[in-house]
């Protein structure tokens, strides 16, 4: 490769990445998932597009795809809270295993019939598109305000279901290449090996990396690089010994993100940029790889297969996978079924048959690409609409306009929160001493216009003041009520109900107040405990229960305990204006 070729490579790469970033602003305006924008830029620059770039290097696409996916999963694991596991771990694992099997089987049967393939080739297509995509899910769910049970289930599922899809794909390719026509017990043992070694190396490698980071004294910019290199080492080792590298790097990130770690905010900040670069690079390469005119001959059967998977296979897999978990409302199941987003993983898996030289390998790739495109356009575009229709959106928590970490101690979790005081806030005109600040927080600075003031207890807050507060992440809900822009009160009333009651209120007192019948229910128990029992599992904000003709909604939690409950009356029925 001469100097001119290298320079052209840099030039083309910089133009494509820059274009992807610039046109990504169209995503929110047009309501199109940003990943589709990246994919479209690659296709436009490709063989059939205006760029005319011929790219058919499948091993290179496989390399870029795996590297990008590893970085995205590492970042996703770092941002996943272990606390979300209390409501979603087992349901997500059920969907990641049983759900993928059901989706693979149903999609494979349809694929074999639609494309006149052997049943094992049909199953191979089903396995290739059988898993939801972490990059797509993390990208499209961020900031949507979904309830915790739905968000956690979808994110954990997308981070843990790739091993099953990879395993099924590799196994079926080996069977087709060797002429096998049946399954053996080795199939199950290999699956257990993938999950077992992946989990062991992911958690073990994450723990060792955590100890190394907290004991090393490095320049601040080197810690994120150490995390990335360590995560990739875990990924590669797990693959080398027959485990799941995808699961391993996700669990490695999960452990690092939920333990005190040196330079946490620097790591998260850089990983955020790297994850975006990985998504852009991966979808650009995959867009360049496809030849759009090859998709037209298979468009109708591929569209039928995509709709079959979206409307039949995915919903049935969710329905079967969530049977043991009664906490899930039908609305939540329907939304989880709809957000079975496919992304880069199926396209990367579709490269496997090409590299193995299987007959019909190009067909498998084109079908997988078409299904991903339909999934992102149909499911991804309709996600906000579906969330509102199925009522899985909860009113957002107020948040600071910015936050930054304070590395006071190697494992310090102190942060600086910046709040802009809007004129609608009740605290305008109040003295600082009147504010009920959370214990352990301090007001560090107050800006008025361009002036830095020295705040004291007698300082009166004015509209458009900027407050800087030092505290911890768990202080954010209380601080938000004091300083942040409050959400529309009408939105809260419409969602949580006409009145909000304390979860500790005695059920018999609530029944007496609202004229309700207990009908054998223990009236001595707290309202929150009764609602939790009716939900049938770990509660999340937004959970709803119908009882005595009223709608009871979980409005606030304290740990696993329901702290506040909203009550909504049917139209035309008034209730007492009291708070218990």
Swiss-Prot record:
Domain of life (superkingdom): Bacteria
Reactions catalysed, as given in the entry: K(+)(in) + H(+)(out) = K(+)(out) + H(+)(in)
Swiss-Prot/TrEMBL keywords: Antiport, Cell inner membrane, Cell membrane, Ion transport, Membrane, Potassium, Potassium transport, Transmembrane, Transmembrane helix, Transport
Membrane topology: Multi-pass membrane protein
Family matches, as Pfam families: CorC_HlyC, Na_H_Exchanger, TrkA_C
Transmembrane feature ranges: 3-23, 34-54, 58-78, 95-115, 122-142, 163-183, 185-205, 218-238, 241-261, 270-290, 303-323, 335-355, 363-383
A GO molecular-function annotation: flavin adenine dinucleotide binding
Compartments where found: Cell inner membrane
SMART domains for this protein: CorC_HlyC
Positions of the RCK C-terminal domain: 403-485
Tagged with keyword Lipid biosynthesis: no
SUPFAM superfamilies associated with the record: FAD-binding/transporter-associated domain-like (SSF56176), TrkA C-terminal domain-like (SSF116726)
Cellular component terms per the entry's GO annotation: plasma membrane
One of the protein's GO biological processes: cell volume homeostasis
Function recorded in the entry: K(+)/H(+) antiporter that extrudes potassium in exchange for external protons and maintains the internal concentration of potassium under toxic levels.
Family stated for the protein in its record: Belongs to the monovalent cation:proton antiporter 1 (CPA1) transporter (TC 2.A.36) family. NhaP2 subfamily.
PANTHER family xref list: K(+)_H(+) ANTIPORTER NHAP2, NA(+)/H(+) ANTIPORTER 1
NCBIfam families: PRK05326.1-1, PRK05326.1-2, PRK05326.1-3
The protein's name in its UniProt record: K(+)/H(+) antiporter NhaP2
């Amino acid at each position: 490769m001469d100097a001119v070729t290298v320079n052209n490579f840099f030039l083309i790469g910089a133009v494509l990445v820059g274009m992807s970033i610039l046109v990504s602003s169209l995503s929110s305006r047009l309501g199109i998932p940003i990943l589709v924008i990246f994919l479209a830029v690659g296709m436009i620059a490709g063989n059939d597009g205006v760029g005319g770039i011929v790219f058919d290097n499948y091993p290179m696409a496989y390399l870029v795809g795996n590297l990008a996916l590893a970085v995205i999963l590492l970042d996703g694991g770092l941002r996943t809270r272990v606390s979300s596991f209390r409501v979603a771990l087992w349901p997500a694992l059920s969907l990641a295993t049983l759900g993928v099997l059901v989706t693979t089987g149903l999609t494979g049967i349809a694929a074999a019939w639609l494309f006149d393939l052997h049943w094992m080739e049909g199953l191979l297509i089903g396995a290739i598109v059988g898993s939801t995509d972490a990059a797509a899910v993390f990208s499209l769910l961020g900031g949507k305000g979904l309830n915790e049970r739905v968000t956690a289930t979808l994110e954990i599922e997308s981070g843990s279901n790739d091993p099953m899809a990879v395993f099924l794909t590799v196994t079926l390719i080996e069977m087709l290449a060797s002429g096998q026509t049946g399954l053996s017990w080795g199939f199950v043992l290999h699956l257990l090996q993938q999950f077992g070694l992946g989990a062991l190396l992911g958690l073990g490698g994450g723990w060792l990396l955590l100890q190394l980071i907290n004991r090393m004294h490095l320049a601040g910019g080197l810690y994120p690089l150490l995390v990335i290199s360590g995560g990739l080492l875990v990924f590669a080792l797990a693959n080398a010994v027959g485990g799941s590298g995808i699961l391993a790097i996700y669990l490695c990130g999960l452990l690092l993100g939920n333990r005190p770690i040196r330079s946490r905010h620097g790591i998260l900040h850089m990983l955020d940029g790297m994850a975006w670069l990985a998504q852009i690079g991966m979808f650009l390469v995959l867009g360049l790889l496809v030849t759009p005119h090859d998709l037209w001959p298979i468009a109708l059967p591929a569209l039928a297969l995509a709709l079959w998977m979206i409307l039949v296979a995915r919903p049935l897999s969710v329905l079967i996978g969530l049977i043991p978990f009664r906490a899930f409302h039908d609305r939540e199941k329907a939304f989880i079924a709809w957000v079975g987003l496919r992304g880069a993983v199926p396209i990367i898996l579709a490269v496997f048959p090409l590299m193995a030289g299987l007959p019909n390998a190009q067909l498998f790739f084109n079908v997988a690409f078409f299904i991903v495109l339909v999934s992102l356009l149909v499911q991804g575009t309709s996600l906000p609409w579906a969330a509102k229709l199925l009522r899985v959106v909860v009113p957002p928590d107020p948040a600071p306009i910015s936050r930054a970490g304070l590395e006071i101690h190697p494992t310090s979790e102190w942060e600086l929160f910046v709040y802009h005081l809007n004129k609608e806030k009740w605290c305008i005109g109040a003295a600082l001493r009147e504010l009920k600040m959370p214990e352990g927080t301090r007001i560090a600075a107050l800006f008025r216009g361009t002036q830095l003031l020295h705040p004291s207890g007698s300082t009166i807050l004015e509209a458009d003041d900027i407050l800087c507060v030092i505290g911890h992440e768990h202080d954010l809900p209380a601080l938000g009520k004091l300083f942040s822009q409050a959400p529309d009160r009408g939105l809260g009333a419409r969602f949580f109900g006409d009145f909000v009651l304390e979860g500790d209120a005695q059920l018999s007192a609530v029944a007496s107040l609202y004229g309700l019948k207990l009908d054998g229910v223990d009236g001595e128990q707290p309202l929150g405990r009764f609602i939790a029992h009716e939900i049938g599992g770990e509660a999340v904000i937004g959970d709803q229960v119908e009882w005595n003709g009223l709608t009871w909604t979980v409005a606030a939690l304290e740990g696993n305990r329901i702290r506040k409950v909203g009550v909504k009356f049917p139209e035309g029925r008034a209730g007492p204006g009291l708070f218990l």
